[in-house]
Amino acid sequence: MREVRKAFEIIPDDQTAPIGYQKIPCHMVFDIKMEDFKRKARLVAGGHKTEAPATITYASVVSRETVRIALMLAALNDLQVKAGDVLNAYITAPCKEKVWTVLGPEFGSEAGKGAIIVRALYGLKSAGAAFRAHLASFMRQMNYTSCKADPDLWYKAETRPDDDTRYYAYILVYVDDILCIHHDAMSVLDRINECLPLKPQSMGDPDIYLGAKLRETRLPNGVWAWGLSPSKYVNQAVQNCQTHLTKKLGGTFKIPAKAANPFPESYSPDTDMTDPLDPECSSFFQHLIGVMRWMVEIGRVDIAVEVSMLSSYLTLPREGHLEAALHIMGYLKQKHNSRLIFDPTYPLIDESDFPEHDWTEFYGDVSEAIPHDMPEPLGKEVDIRMMTDSDHAGCKTTRRSRTGILIFCNLALIQWISKRQPTIETSVFGAEFVAMKHGIEILRGLRYKLRMMGVPLTGPSFVYGDNKSQVTNCSVPESTLKKKSHSICYHAIRESVAMGETRITHISTGDNLADPLTKCTFGAKRRRLLGNILYDLYDDFN
């Protein structure tokens, strides 16, 4: 309680709380941290009693895509990556709300006294935003600038002392977890520690970040790269699932002992007509989907399509859907090891596969929009590749197709998507157009983000699709559109090519790594495609 005492200012016995201040309760919350099984107690304010502030209430949350990009850039530019965790983060910031409370017995001799809450105590609706503003003011004092494409990424131009190379140092903030990328990262953490006290044991090489183990790995080509492994999170999730099935559901449902694939080969969730789940089992199913969606976010690309399919049935799940979710858990129990490596190696791109054409007659003198306020590009340039695919009419009941997208910066997988298309297409040709247009829009946002991070980006993004007709229609100026229903996608993609933002070529279906994100794959094909994305997943087959 010594640390939290500074969050209160005692009201003298002969005075009352100032006019306009609202009385709220405070209570202790006890927990056990699963990372190291330490007991933890935290004093929490009853923020549910107050009105939501008119200003923002969110905390600093850097996007996962930004984290992957930053880790790839760290390896590409040979920079250190160090981590730190702010000690009692929220109470380092001043409180933005007018609230007071009566101190409880945990305050000893001061119990029963009125006190104004002067720090951003956990539980207050404005606590996250207060800490973010407090941290932001210190970042600006250190001459770091918030990235306009991701406000919780801070960057600063630096010079390496050994060769005078200029680059951008980055600080990534995820609530109270700080990741520093710099040629002397510990010195930056030491300076942060002067203003925001960091937990001493947390300062140094990163260990667990966003629920995944973060470590540096030496690849077969001799390159050092950072990788995320969610194995610990996966094992804990499987264990928690087994415990819940036994203690809460009485063993009615079980995790299968063997599951070589996320789904059984004959299973399709959209044709499942089993009985609907009761409210308790429905809540558990929704919880499982939430856990598995986070697994996908931190690197389990191999279950992305199955989790996406089941996510469509959160409002009315059936017994078969829960059994399918448990089958995924059985697969994860068997295949818990995987690593997503952010390899900075430049890919081998044969530009002769991407012939250039004169598009002036069709779209005029168009060019890619370059942000006028982007920082000066520093460091090494990156190459961007995207693979797209679709499964036409994959959903048996709605006839909606599914889009699969993989985006790489150099050889590092940065973004992946498995999602049902919003429209019902009558042909494979149309479904492929919708998928590629979606990918082009994401690429445009990624290129903007890279430029606003100060990453040199001069060439186009290279796009691969496995439908020859669609690729020809997009990449050859004289190709005509036969169906007006595809005109928006048709012109959006072609204009991107005309402005030099993208270049498109054909790739065989067997080599399209986006294929497992459109449909369930099995056997040798699954191992071959996913083995090119995730390390350790199929090592037992090597």
Labelled PLM ranges:
Residues 134-182, 186-191, 195-202, 295-306, ...:
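Active-site palm subdomain of RNA-directed nucleic acid polymerases
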Residues 1-137, 141-148, 153, 240, ...:
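Chromodomain-type histone methyl-lysine reader module
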Residues 1-2, 28, 70, 85, ...:
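Mobile genetic element proteins and their domesticated derivatives, centered on retroelements
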